[in-house]
Amino acid sequence: MRRLMIDQLFKLTGHRFKDEEKLKRALTHASVQDSEQGNYERLEFLGDRVLGLLIAEMLYQLFPQASEGELSVRLNHLVNAQTCADIAREMRLPDMIQVGFEMRNFEGRRLINMHADVVEALIAVMYLDGGLESVRPFIQKYWQSRAKKMDAGRRDAKTELQEWAHIQGDAQPHYQVIKRSGPDHDPVFMVEVSISGFASEIGQGSSKRNAERMAAEKILRREGVWKTVEKNDYE
């Protein structure tokens, strides 16, 4: 493995990798058939669990008053493929990944998943090198600011409700207009949102979209998902 790449990864992660073979494996996709060192799949499996644990720990300390429901939504957002892929691109990892010829035109969701997998595989290598303490600075560097920004401006209530419902058991929110009143130039919509296993809520607004958002907010607040007092530092 090129020394320049190893030095670059040290600058990006803050970790001096001890096992060069595992590092090569973390950057190798399964489509590389003649690869002697194997691919990143097993490492990604381990790294996914390490990432989840350290993000959960970080959120537990950052938001001491947050409910379990809110912490779960935040965790899901911070460890999902899109966030990990964004971090991979921030680190310019895609340029380092070895892929087979047929995979060089990856795009869309498959590309996002591959970039995310490599981040998790690198986390596994760090963990195997030196345990959780070897990974924690890397998590702080790339995830802590993202965790804090999530509270600086709330995400769309419908998006957050959908994520929360998924965590509860692959449920999906269903929205239904139950009433429309008022003149055409000043309408009032009432929308009911329901999730299997939970009581429904009704929102009201000047548009269908606003009414849906209000209904989603009611469930998020009722279930304690939207209730936060933020702590400034994660130590």
From Swiss-Prot:
Catalytic reaction list: Endonucleolytic cleavage to 5'-phosphomonoester
Residues that hold Mg(2+) according to the record: 44, 117, 120
Domain DRBM intervals: 156-225
Keyword Nuclease tagged: yes
Main subcellular location: cytoplasm
Alphabetically ordered keywords of this record: Cytoplasm, Endonuclease, Hydrolase, Magnesium, Metal-binding, mRNA processing, Nuclease, RNA-binding, rRNA processing, rRNA-binding, tRNA processing
GO CC, any one term: cytoplasm
Boundaries of every RNase III domain copy: 6-131
Enzyme class: hydrolase
Cofactor: Mg(2+)
Subcellular location: Cytoplasm
Active site annotation, chain numbering: 48, 120
MF term (GO), any: rRNA binding
InterPro entries from the UniProt entry: dsRBD_dom, RNase_III, RNase_III_dom, RNase_III_sf
Origin superkingdom: Bacteria
Enzyme Commission number: 3.1.26.3
CDD domains on file: DSRM_RNAse_III_family, RIBOc
Biological processes, Gene Ontology terms: mRNA processing; regulation of gene expression; rRNA processing; tRNA processing
NCBIfam families: RNaseIII (TIGR02191)
Family of the protein in this entry: Belongs to the ribonuclease III family.
Subunit structure and binding partners: Homodimer.
Function: Digests double-stranded RNA. Involved in the processing of primary rRNA transcript to yield the immediate precursors to the large and small rRNAs (23S and 16S). Processes some mRNAs, and tRNAs when they are encoded in the rRNA operon. Processes pre-crRNA and tracrRNA of type II CRISPR loci if present in the organism.
The protein's name in its UniProt record: Ribonuclease 3
